[in-house]
A protein has these predicted regions:
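N-terminal pre-catalytic "stem/leader" segment of glycosyltransferase-like enzymes
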Residues: 1-83, 87, 95-100, 111
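A short, histidine- and acid-enriched strand-loop-helix "catalytic/donor-clamping" loop
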Residues: 81, 104-120
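Carbohydrate-associated surface elements
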Residues: 147, 167-168
Length: 250
């Protein structure tokens, strides 16, 4: 049988950002492809000591994995929400029982942290070791694009077991395509608008105009050619958007 690991956020499950959107869409798509959920029972390990939290997450994962049999396939979204120091060991043990394990990658922490001076070196090393050890043993990986694929290959992961997804799917219930778009309309920027993520928004030139959607925007610093519309849930955002072209950034 085909399964996907259904991990649930312990906090901020209804946050007005796209953090959960990609994961939820992957789950919806694989369910349509015949995958069944494999749900680990996890308590709030944020309130536990480091050692106890690691043990609790490993035990929850082990219990979920115990349902799988030889010939089964398991898809895991990466990074895992409830990763532990024992995850690589548990996946190896699962594979030894004849289960194929695949990962679809949303983010690589090592790429996000590599140029940040604020992240301690020991944390960078720990993240790199955890990511590389787990991804190297996967039976297959779905990467963002050829650049991420090349990065993984350079880390020693076999090119033959990596495929590139390209642009992520974005499921929109009851979507209706908007008409009469033109280049004369304001440019749309949607996402995390905080200074540390989108600092350029606070020093744009006078033209063109921009329509902004998302969390973290400092309205007191809004420019004359910027209109802030607030934040929306991911499924509600496409309907609320007003403007012409969208600006892709990160």
């Amino acid at each position: 049988m085909k399964y996907y690991l259904k991990e649930e956020f312990l906090k901020d499950s209804g946050a007005r950002n796209a953090g959960n959107k990609a994961r939820n869409d992957v789950e919806e798509i694989v369910k349509q492809e015949g995958f069944s959920p494999l749900l680990p029972t996890v308590e709030d390990w944020y309130k536990m000591s480091t050692i106890k939290a690691q043990q609790h997450k490993a035990q929850a994962l082990s219990q979920a994995f115990s349902r799988l049999k030889s010939g089964d396939q398991l898809l895991i979204q990466f990074p895992m929400l409830h990763h532990s120091f024992f995850t690589t060991y548990l996946v190896k043990r699962l594979q030894a029982r004849g289960v194929k394990v695949y990962f679809i990658i949303h983010d690589l922490e090592v790429l996000r942290y590599v140029n940040l001076d604020t992240v301690p070196l020991k944390h960078k090393i720990r993240v790199q070791l955890q990511e590389s050890s787990l991804l190297k043993i996967a039976d297959g990986l779905i990467a963002h694009n050829r650049i991420m694929k090349s990065f993984l290959v350079n880390k020693g992961i076999s090119e033959q077991k990596i495929v590139s997804l390209g642009i992520f799917d974005y499921l929109i219930p009851d979507f209706q395509e908007k008409e009469e778009l033109s280049k004369d309309q304001p440019i749309i920027v949607a996402g995390n608008l905080a200074q540390e993520k989108a600092g350029y928004l606070y020093k744009l030139s006078e033209n063109p105009a921009y329509n902004l959607y998302g969390v973290g925007f400092d309205e007191s610093r809004a420019l004359e050619n910027e209109t802030y519309f607030g934040s929306f849930l991911p499924d509600e955002l496409p309907v609320a958007l007003e403007g012409g072209f969208g600006l892709v950034w990160d």
